């Protein structure tokens, strides 16, 4: 049987991103409805797609549709013959293509608004709001975020919702399944928004809602076995984080001991991390694991380096070098076994496992237009450039919460599935300044105390990510009767659904007091603790 691609396994909704801060939420809402969807940049040429979507959603955008540099969709999308939903800018783009008028409006709408649904009496035109219960006053609360709006309907379109200041809040084509809404149904501030999206993807597009982690496991295991064959071997880097652990366990379930995990100790891991990961993967999960201690090499190359991008490149390049050397040993052993045992031996090592997630893919997309690469992700690209291996990424289509759900279904213990994310470059990007053994030891100790206190307070599972950053500043303090001049650490904790946006976590004051007291008393060289209360955006989760 030929390898089945995901689009042949699941009906797919195509989301075309025009750079909206909410675009990823459209994807999340579809996934929550057990509908598979994929987001691509708005510049995507439809003729280049190897698959046909069941429907298309056009996202919002910070641009004005009539601006000279405004992004525009490939007109071929309207010849696919599938349902289309435009959200905010997407509505305006539909109007532009079909001959409507969009202008800057004197009364901009930002925040909550109440829309009135207009029934046309025709099933296809009314489908977007069909079955949605209105509020007591007959309206529907939604979230607006637009300065431009549709001022004249395109030919053959009708109004299906309005507000006092926006007469064309939602529109539908008279005879084709093309819809547009000026509000944002994907955000939580539109209470019935998910139902609007459900009406489009399920009722209008008739998508089969087969996307779930329960259905994903057997299909992905079958796909892996088909790719690797009966004897093909796979190597993969693991860190002890959720992504690589779940990927390793899934691979082990598919091909057993033909999967070889490699952990590279780069010297900037969490306290005792290498020992903990070795036990976790080998004893608890039964995965073949080799741990390579390359800390001396990494730290030597990081000496004197302060720039975060240089740190990333040094760690990334050194990791590749060390990983390739260890992989070569495993490949040589496989070749030797093949020569000695012939047909009874396992096959060659042909594949490289990576735990890439869908947010990595989204944030790594770079194109001319409203979206741009936010930062280089260590999971995307780089490792295969010098290796004669083919890439296998079983988690590439998944969000973090889906990966955790997958891990639970694979019977990975909760304390492993629930671990907070840890960056590929490790503590090097949590040390603002030069990375030295002394700085690493300080940060490891402070971070260990912080996480211990968060767990003790019963808050760990309520927080999406928590860590300590070591700042490149010193502050005056008092210890006993003596003046101190020591370093400052920042503690960070965020809550998020998918790490595309995040809010800072509100700790009880007594917990923060305990954290600060323990760190300043127990960590030599630190006399001040600050708490980071920055959301994403405008900040990122990590400091560097």
Swiss-Prot record:
Its cofactor is Mg(2+). It catalyses: XMP + L-glutamine + ATP + H2O = GMP + L-glutamate + AMP + diphosphate + 2 H(+). It comes from the Eukaryota. XMP binds at residues 312, 481, 536, 542. Pathway: Purine metabolism; GMP biosynthesis; GMP from XMP (L-Gln route): step 1/1. ATP binds at residues 239-245. Residues 12-210 form the Glutamine amidotransferase type-1 domain. Residues 211-419 form the GMPS ATP-PPase domain. GO terms for biological process: GMP biosynthetic process. InterPro entries: Class_I_gatase-like, GATASE, GMP_synth_C, GMP_synth_GATase, GMP_synthase, GMPS_ATP_PPase_dom, NAD/GMP_synthase, Rossmann-like_a/b/a_fold. Catalyzes the conversion of xanthine monophosphate (XMP) to GMP in the presence of glutamine and ATP through an adenyl-XMP intermediate. HAMAP family: GMP_synthase. This is GMP synthase [glutamine-hydrolyzing]. It comes from Cryptococcus neoformans var. neoformans serotype D (strain JEC21 / ATCC MYA-565). The gene is GUA1.
């Amino acid at each position: 049987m030929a390898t089945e691609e995901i689009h042949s396994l699941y009906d797919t909704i195509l989301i075309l991103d025009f750079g909206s801060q909410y675009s990823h939420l459209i994807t999340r809402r579809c996934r929550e409805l057990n509908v598979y969807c994929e987001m691509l940049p708005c510049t995507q040429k439809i003729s280049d797609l190897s698959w046909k979507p069941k429907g298309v959603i056009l996202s919002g955008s910070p641009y004005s549709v009539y601006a000279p540099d405004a992004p525009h969709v490939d007109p071929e999308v309207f010849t696919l013959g599938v349902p289309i939903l435009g959200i905010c800018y997407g509505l305006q783009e539909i109007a532009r293509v079909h001959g409507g008028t969009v202008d800057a409006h004197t009364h901009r709408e930002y925040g909550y608004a109440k829309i009135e649904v207009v029934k046309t009496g025709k099933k296809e035109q009314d489908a977007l709001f069909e079955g949605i219960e209105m509020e007591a006053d007959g309206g529907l609360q939604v979230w607006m975020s637009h300065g431009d709006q549709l001022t004249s309907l395109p030919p053959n379109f009708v109004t299906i919702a309005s507000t006092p200041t926006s007469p064309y809040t939602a529109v539908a084509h008279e005879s084709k399944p093309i819809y547009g809404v000026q509000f944002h149904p994907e955000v939580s501030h539109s209470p019935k928004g998910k139902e609007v999206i459900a009406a489009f993807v399920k009722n209008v597009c008739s998508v089969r809602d087969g996307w779930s982690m329960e259905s994903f496991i057997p299909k992905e295991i079958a796909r892996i076995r088909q790719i690797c064959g009966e004897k093909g071997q796979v190597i993969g880097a693991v860190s002890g984080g959720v992504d690589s652990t779940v990927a390793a366990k899934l691979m082990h379930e598919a091909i057993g001991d033909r999967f070889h995990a490699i952990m590279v100790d780069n010297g900037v891991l969490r306290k005792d991390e290498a020992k903990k990961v070795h036990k976790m993967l080998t004893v608890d999960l039964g995965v073949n694991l080799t741990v390579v201690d390359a800390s001396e090499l990494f730290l030597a190359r990081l000496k004197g380096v302060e720039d975060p991008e240089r740190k990333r490149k040094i760690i990334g390049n050194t990791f590749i070098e060390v990983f390739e050397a260890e992989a070569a040993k495993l490949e040589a052993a496989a070749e030797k076994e093949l020569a000695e045992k012939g047909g009874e031996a396992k096959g060659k090592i042909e594949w490289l496992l990576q735990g890439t997630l869908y947010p990595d893919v989204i944030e790594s997309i770079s194109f001319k237009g409203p979206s741009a690469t936010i930062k280089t992700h260590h999971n995307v690209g780089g490792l295969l450039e010098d290796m004669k291996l083919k890439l296998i990424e079983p988690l590439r289509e998944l969000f973090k919460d889906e990966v955790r759900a997958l891990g639970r279904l694979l019977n990975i213990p909760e304390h492993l599935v629930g671990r907070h994310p840890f960056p590929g470059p490790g503590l090097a990007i949590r040390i603002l300044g030069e990375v030295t053994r002394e700085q690493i030891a300080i940060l490891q100790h402070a971070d260990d105390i912080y996480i211990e206190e968060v767990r003790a307070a019963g808050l760990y599972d309520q927080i999406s990510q928590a860590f300590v950053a070591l700042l490149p500043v010193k502050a005056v303090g008092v210890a006993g009767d003596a003046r101190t001049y020591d370093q400052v650490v920042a503690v960070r904790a965020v809550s998020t659904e998918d790490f595309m946006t995040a809010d800072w976590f509100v700790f009880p004051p007594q917990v923060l007091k305990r954290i600060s007291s323990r760190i300043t008393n127990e960590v030599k060289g630190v006399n001040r603790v600050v708490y980071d209360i920055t959301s994403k955006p405008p900040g990122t989760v990590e400091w560097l």
